[in-house]
């Protein structure tokens, strides 16, 4: 009998795309401290657009979880997202010279629109498996790239803090929890988990590509 975890199986089924994402040029340049400000600005402006849909998805996780313990974990997660991570974005925009006007007027890239739609689709299903699957990809893929390079953090604080936000003890615990939840409930809804996992990973890779296709020059 196989002892492979369900979440590991899902990642293996998307191995090629997952590896392209976690070893992307963006990740390499981030650790090298060579990523251009215009690329970093584009990436962060678009990533910040996820916040509203991500909170919708987290809200759905609270209401569809089947026990108190996971509800409490997701509620805690909401507080964390609204705190330190939100502060990072605002500080980074200031450091990169991205004005409020730019943040408001620059349109979504296709991957941004696609991932926001996927999160809202998962939330609308009221299917706990779909919801946890999308949450897991959004977090686990980032933990993977953030922990693959053992070099000291970059000197640029915008780069260093983005890495740190995806490699600290509580973040590791969050991914462990999400994996345990999907390992627990996913096998009974295998097709749903496979579908949402595959689509989420594909969009994550496209999102990295888009940062280079749509650079943003700060105004101030």
Pin down the residues of each PLM region.
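Hydrophobic alpha-helical segments
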Residues: 2-6, 118-121, 209, 213, ...
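Long, non-globular segments of proteins
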Residues: 4-5, 9, 145
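Short alpha-helical hairpin
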Residues: 11-36, 175-184, 217
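Alpha-helical bundle segments that constitute or directly flank the non-heme di-iron/ferroxidase center
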Residues: 15-20, 34-64, 80-84, 133-143, ...
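Active-site-proximal alpha-helical scaffolds that flank and shape metal-associated catalytic sites
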Residues: 45, 69-170, 198, 202
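Structural helix-adjacent loops and short alpha-helical linkers that scaffold large soluble proteins
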Residues: 65-69, 191-194
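Long amphipathic all-alpha helical oligomerization modules
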Residues: 171-197
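Acidic, carboxylate-rich catalytic segments that either coordinate divalent cations
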Residues: 193-220
């Amino acid at each position: 009998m196989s002892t492979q975890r369900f979440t590991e199986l899902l990642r293996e089924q998307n191995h090629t795309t997952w590896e392209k994402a976690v070893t992307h040029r963006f990740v390499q340049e981030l650790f090298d401290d060579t990523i251009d400000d215009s690329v970093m600005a584009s990436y962060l402006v678009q990533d910040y657009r996820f916040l509203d849909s991500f909170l919708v998805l987290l809200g759905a996780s609270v209401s569809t979880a089947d026990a108190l313990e996971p509800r409490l974990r997701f509620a805690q997660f909401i507080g964390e997202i609204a705190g330190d991570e939100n502060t990072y974005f605002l500080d980074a925009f200031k450091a990169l010279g991205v004005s409020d006007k730019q943040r408001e007027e620059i349109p979504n890239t296709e991957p941004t629109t696609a991932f926001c739609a996927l999160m809202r689709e998962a939330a609308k299903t009221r299917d706990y498996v779909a919801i946890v699957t999308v949450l897991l990809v959004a977090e686990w893929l980032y933990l993977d790239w953030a922990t693959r390079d053992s070099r000291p953090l970059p000197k640029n604080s915008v780069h260093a803090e983005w890495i740190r936000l995806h490699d600290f003890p509580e973040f590791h615990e969050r991914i462990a929890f999400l994996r345990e939840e999907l390992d627990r409930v996913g096998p009974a809804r295998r097709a749903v988990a496979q579908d949402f996992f595959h689509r989420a990973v594909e969009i994550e890779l496209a999102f990295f590509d888009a940062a280079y296709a749509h650079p943003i020059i700060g105004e101030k």
